C-alpha cells in the first residue's frame, strides 16, 4: 500500500513507516492543490501537518484513499465532512504536542506581562528604556481558560505553579472534575469580567469561530490581557484590534491568526502584542512524538488493526477495534 507524506514529518516517523513491510512511502513536500489532485489517486494514506489543504476537490479524486492522518491536532485544513462521506478515515495525534503547546502559552503570557520582545528590540537599537517597559506580575492574578481539554489542563497546572488562580469555561467538563484540579467553572459571560488573563484552547469549529468577539471583549475588565495559541479565528481580530487601540485590553499574545500569515493585518502595527509564527508545537520533542504516533496509527489502520484518534467515526463500520 502507498503512503504520501505531503508536509515535513520528523525522520523517526518516516523511518518507522519505511521499515514496515508492504508499505511504499513517498515524500512530496509543498505540493500545490493542483499537484495533489493529480497525484493523490494512487495513494492509500495521506499524512499531513497544517500546510497541506485536503479539500473536497482532493478527496473526490482520491479513489484509493483510506486514511487521512493529521500529524498534530488541528483539522481545519482537512474537509472532514467530505472525507467521511467517502468513507475515508480521518485521524489526528492530539497528545503529541500537548506539553509544547502548554509551555508556549505560559511563555507567551510571561513575555506579554514583562514586555520581553519589545524590550529586546529596544536594547538591540541601543536604547535603555527601563521605565517604558514596566511590567506586571502574574502571581495572584486570575487566569481564565476557555477549553479545559488536554492543552488547557496542562496550562492550568503550570499557571497554578505560578500561584495564579485558575478559572475556566468548558461545557464538556463537569464541575466535579474541574474542582479535582483546583479549577472553578463558570459560564463564559460570568468568567470574562473576572479575568486578568484570558487564554483559549479549543478547536476551530462553527461553534468556536469568533466566540471571543466585540461583545465578549466588552465584558472583560479594562487592562486584561488575551492569549491565543490555539487556532486563528476563535478571537475576532477586528474586535481585538479595536479593544487594544482604545486601551480596553492592555495587551495580547498571538501564535495563530485568522489568515495563516498575517502580514497585512493591522495588528502588526501595535506594540502591545507579542507575536509568534504558530510555534506552539514547534519543539524537537513534539515533532518527534507526533511523527511516531501518527506513523503507528496509519500502519495499524491500513493493516486492519486498532484504529486510534479517529474524528470521522461514521467511517469505521468495517473496523472492529476503536481506541479514543
Predicted regions and their residues:
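An N-terminal-biased, well-structured beta-alpha scaffold segment characteristic
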Residues: 1-91, 191-193, 213-219, 236
